């Protein structure tokens, strides 16, 4: 059967959802690995990554079941949810690519003071830095309580803000690029589901409704 027929659309939709399932399982696995090795101890970060992985896994399972059974209702809701995810993810990805360093610095500065002292100290040890941006009274207090390895050396410690900016700039570009790529795969998924949903199953009763 030529590609574009019922079997080809079904196989393409199944393959796409298998990829989504693998990505979802990968996110859950990475979060569990990071928690197990102590790479990330924040329960909010771990919970967020696992939630995204589970959500993606559920969408993929719904799409896969809908594709295998040619289930009209499941395919309809799959298209709606995937379309909404595309709009949200596309907007977030564009924002990640468009955000400048000044805005990043403001976000980092605001986030730093929300963190608990234990989380700040953990970040300082991980990135081998002390304090955030400027030599204010608060920074001096942070520097005094800092337990990073750089405190044992004669040279002054680098401020964490500059280190965070370097990492955040690179991370935002990667996240934005990956997000845009997955956004277009979601549009492909919506198109495949719509096409497949409107096709007639050759094994079904010819007089039955689509």
Swiss-Prot record:
Keyword tags:
Glycoprotein, Membrane, Transmembrane, Transmembrane helix
Q: Where are the transmembrane segments?
A: 13-33, 45-65, 73-93, 174-194
Membrane topology, record value = Multi-pass membrane protein
List residues in topological domain: Cytoplasmic.
1-12, 66-72, 195-210
Write down a Pfam family by its short name: Tetraspanin
Asked if Glycoprotein is a keyword of the record, the answer is yes
Source organism's superkingdom? Eukaryota
- Record's subcellular location: Membrane
Q: Which residues are glycosylated?
A: 109, 117, 134
Q: Which InterPro entries match?
A: Tetraspanin/Peripherin, Tetraspanin_animals
Q: Which residues lie on this side of the membrane: Extracellular?
A: 34-44, 94-173
Family label: Belongs to the tetraspanin (TM4SF) family.
Q: Any idea what this protein is called?
A: Tetraspanin-31
Species this chain originates from: Rattus norvegicus (Rat)
Output the lineage of the source organism.
Eukaryota, Metazoa, Chordata, Craniata, Vertebrata
Gene that this polypeptide is encoded by: Tspan31
């Amino acid at each position: 059967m030529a590609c574009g027929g019922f079997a080809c659309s079904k196989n393409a939709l199944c393959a796409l959802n298998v990829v989504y399932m693998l990505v979802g399982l990968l996110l859950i696995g990475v979060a569990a690995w990071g928690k197990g090795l102590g790479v990330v101890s924040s329960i909010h970060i771990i919970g967020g990554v696992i939630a995204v992985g589970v959500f993606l896994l559920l969408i993929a399972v719904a799409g896969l079941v809908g594709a295998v059974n040619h289930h009209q209702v499941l395919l309809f809701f799959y298209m709606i949810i995937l379309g909404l995810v595309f709009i949200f993810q596309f907007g977030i990805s564009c924002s990640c690519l468009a955000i400048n360093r000044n805005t990043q610095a403001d976000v980092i500065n605001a986030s730093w003071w929300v963190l608990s002292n234990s989380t700040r100290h953990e970040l300082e040890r991980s990135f081998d830095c002390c304090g955030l941006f400027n030599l204010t009274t608060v920074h001096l207090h942070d520097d005094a309580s800092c337990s990073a390895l750089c405190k044992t050396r004669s040279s002054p410690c680098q401020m964490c803000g500059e280190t965070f900016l370097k990492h955040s700039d690179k991370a935002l570009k990667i996240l934005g690029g990956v997000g845009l790529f997955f956004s277009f795969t979601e549009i492909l998924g919506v198109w495949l589901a719509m096409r497949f949903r409107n096709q007639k199953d050759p094994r079904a009763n010819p007089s039955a409704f689509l």
